[in-house]
Amino acid sequence: SGKPYVIENVPGAPLIKPVQFCGSSFGLMVRRHRLFESNVPLVGSVCDHKTQGRPVGIYGSMRDEIPSGGHTAKTIEQAREAMGIDWMLWGDLVEAIPPRYTFEIGKQLMSVLK
């Protein structure tokens, strides 16, 4: 169709020339790496894990310990804050993309499509 598109998926997914976004780049407490493919040039974010501190996991069950260190969110409030989302329940948060990612993608798309 020639219209702009963006496809999101997880690392390892078969996308064409994807860019990656990470919550640590935006000051979020999640390391939710996501890939984005587009027919419009996008610039991904650079991970900032070293200054992020111990990330909060938003998957599985709340209050789980993570074998490699860290934990999943202890409360729904902690999960919402880590993701930058204040309206979702746990079941929605575990499937969500932080809005900061889509804000950045939208900003980049708008600058190209002007």
Regions found by a protein language model. Name each.
Residues 1-113:
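Class I S-adenosyl-L-methionine
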